[in-house]
Design a protein with these regions (language model features):
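Catalytic loop of short-chain dehydrogenase/reductase
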Residues: 140-163, 168-177, 189-190, 258
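Conserved glycine-rich Rossmann-like NAD(P)H-binding loop of the short-chain dehydrogenase/reductase
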Residues: 32-46
Length: 270
């Protein structure tokens, strides 16, 4: 199937590694020129060079900390200038610390909201006027299934994600008249560079051996495994296609049918 993406342009946040890198690569493979951002310059530039060499597309690395408004504005403006227009905005940067309520500090909660939620708000504040002026666009927000499938160990991510999901649905209602459509993608556990750290945190909080903690997430998923980066990236690329423009104001889980309550019960038995 031709996704009608060849020649399009995209901004992808958190693009130096993990899901963001996978999305940038998958978009470029479909003929999209991409501007990516991250806080660390060296891995960001290495990723851009790697994807550009592989796909022969224009990949623009822009160093930015999306917890800072000035950096966010600079990323959007530089990306727009380098690409000429912004057809697709993929918000992906940011993560929230897992943990139970008594282990989460004020700084943990601030981190959850400042980057994972407010980072998306900042990007949209600057990119949506560009899309309005050019006659339309597509926004895909990577959020997380914690916002719709609560778990006591993921209370901070759940709160930030629920806010992001509400933001996505609300903006779909506001900007439809401008031919801008919105969709949220809610991954469950994904095998990224961060996965080992998340398992270590679960092992700490639940007082489990690392090997046992690593089995908790797969045990809560009917398919028996966590997702791979490429699986999430493929869904995002499909949703970014003009063919999917009517998939608007909605959210899609990609978590293998995970049952979060089962994961909590498995923890409670330990």
């Amino acid at each position: 199937m031709d996704l009608k993406l060849n020649g399009k342009t995209a901004l992808v946040t958190g693009g130096s590694e993990g899901i963001g890198k996978g999305i940038a690569r998958a978009l470029a493979q479909e003929g999209v020129d991409v501007a990516i951002c991250a806080r660390r310059k060296e891995p960001l530039e290495a990723t851009a060079a790697e994807i550009a060499k592989e796909t022969k597309r224009k990949i623009v690395p822009i160093t930015a900390d999306l917890s800072k408004d000035a950096d966010t504005r600079s990323f959007v403006e530089q990306g727009h200038k380098a690409l000429g227009r912004v057809d697709i905005m993929v918000n992906n940067a940011g993560s929230s610390p897992g943990g139970v309520l008594e282990h989460l500090s004020e700084a943990d909660w601030e981190q959850s909201l400042q980057l994972k939620f407010m980072g998306y708000v900042r990007c949209l504040r600057y990119v949506l006027p560009i899309m309005v002026k050019q006659g339309g666009g597509r926004v895909v927000n990577l959020i997380g299934n914690d916002g719709v499938k609560p778990s006591y160990w993921e209370i901070a991510p759940g709160a930030a994600n629920a806010a992001g999901q509400n933001l996505t649905m609300s903006l779909a209602g506001q900007y439809g008249k401008d031919n801008i459509s919105f969709c949220a993608v809610n991954p469950g556990p994904v095998r990224t560079e961060r996965w080992a750290g998340l398992v270590a945190a679960m092992a700490r909080d639940m007082k489990l051996p690392h090997a046992e903690a690593d089995k908790l997430a797969p045990s809560s998923i009917p398919l028996g495994r966590i997702a791979e980066i490429e699986e999430v990236a493929n869904l995002v690329v499909m949703l970014a296609s003009p063919l999917m423009h009517m998939v608007n104001g909605t959210q899609i889980e990609i978590d293998g049918g995970q049952e979060k309550s089962l994961m909590d019960r498995l923890r409670d038995r330990k």
